[in-house]
UniProtKB/Swiss-Prot annotation:
The gene is nadA. Keywords: 4Fe-4S, Cytoplasm, Iron, Iron-sulfur, Metal-binding, Pyridine nucleotide biosynthesis, Transferase. GO terms for cellular component: cytosol. Its main location: cytoplasm. The lineage of its organism: Bacteria, Pseudomonadati, Pseudomonadota, Gammaproteobacteria, Vibrionales. Binds 1 [4Fe-4S] cluster per subunit. This is Quinolinate synthase. Belongs to the quinolinate synthase family. Type 1 subfamily. Its cofactor is [4Fe-4S] cluster.
Length: 353
């Protein structure tokens, strides 16, 4: 059983799209970035939702492409003293939480996440204080301050197991911040959950009606859906899962066409694994409606070559991530609780968004 809070009105100030670079400019920035990575003892770590050229550069230079938790864990293990995180701000914070001794740079600190923006730490903490009998479970797509208020931090692949574990102990749960993922988990587990009311601007736009029409055009296609999508979209899926799980599903499912309902940045890695298959963007918005994100996170798009070069060459307060040490230690507790639980289950934690 789930109870959804009244919607908190949050205005998401979408950033302007980066000015496109010419091929010559791209080549120049790529060469400069490669040189700077060596000079600064740095490694580029990119999320699946960044632009393909950023993911390609990360792989070419010995970096990494993955989900947010995989990114933080890779950075923790890598010998480089500086990590440049291609993603959104909470991902840089996660890297700093797990690897405090390293310098964490981001192309821009203005790369936000609507789930993070939709869950202000002060308001969320007040709500938690009003329900002291509830166990607080938060999605990884949150600020360090929200993580510090939680009992558990979860990723989408382990969330069901953790909620089932808590439900077996008859513990009521506060879930934040993604209402769609929370509803999906509540439906699957039957747990008593109070859901914070925020959503991912990308996944919230996927339309069940439009998806049905697309399925009519591609009747043999499999539908892959991230659980941050509305329930009506999830119900149409052949496979539901996190970014890493969807990539795995694309490889394992027999269909040769895949309709993919998540950020289209994922196509870069997915196509690498299934070059023989046709990947199709799931439709956003509805009939006559205009999409806002259009299946690509506007903040992820801020991680351009120019911004990466500037972060490496200039650094400074506009690019470096700092997390208060007391807050870092506190937020590490629920994160380690998840990692320990996953180890007990003998499973590999694969991440969120």
């Amino acid at each position: 059983m789930s109870h959804i809070l009244d919607k908190i009105e949050t205005v998401y100030p979408f950033p302007p799209k980066p000015i496109p670079l010419s091929q010559e400019e791209k080549a120049d920035y790529i060469e400069r970035i490669k040189k700077l990575l060596k000079e600064k003892d740095a490694v580029l770590i990119a999320h699946y939702y960044t632009d393909p050229e950023i993911q390609a550069l990360a792989e070419e230079t010995g970096g990494f492409v993955g989900d947010s938790l995989e990114m933080a864990k890779f950075g923790n293990r890598h010998p480089a003293s500086t990590l440049i995180i291609g993603g959104v701000r909470f991902m840089g914070e996660s890297a700093k939480i797990l690897t405090p001794e390293k310098r964490i740079l981001m192309p821009t600190l203005e790369a936000e996440c609507s789930l993070d923006l939709g869950c202000p730490a002060d308001k969320f903490s007040e709500f938690c204080d009003a329900h002291p009998d509830h166990t607080v479970v938060v999605y990884a797509n949150t600020s360090a301050a929200v993580k510090a208020r939680a009992d558990w931090v979860v990723t989408s692949s382990i969330a069901l197991d953790i909620v089932e574990h808590l439900d077996a102990e008859d513990k009521p749960i506060i879930w934040g911040p993604d209402r769609h993922l929370g509803s999906y988990i509540a439906k699957k587990t039957g747990a008593d959950m109070l859901l914070w009311h925020a959503e991912c601007v990308v996944h919230d736009e996927f339309s069940a009606d439009a998806l049905r029409k697309m399925k009519n055009v591609y009747p043999d296609a499999a539908i892959l859906v991230h659980p941050e999508s509305p329930a009506s979209v999830v119900e149409l899926a052949d496979a539901v899962g996190s970014t890493s799980q969807l990539i795995k599903a694309a490889k394992e499912l027999p269909q040769q066409q895949m309709i993919v309902a998540t950020d289209k940045g994922i196509f870069f890695k997915m196509q690498q694994l299934v070059p023989e298959k046709e990947l199709i963007e799931a439709p956003t918005a509805g009939a006559g409606a205009t999409c806002r994100s259009c299946a690509h996170c506007p903040w992820m798009a801020m991680n351009g070559l120019k911004a990466i070069e500037k972060a490496l060459s200039e650094g400074g307060a506009e690019h470096e991530i700092f997390v208060d040490e007391a807050l870092r230690v506190k937020s590490l507790i629920p994160l380690n609780r998840m990692l320990d639980f996953a180890e007990q289950l003998n499973m590999q934690v694969k991440g969120n968004a």
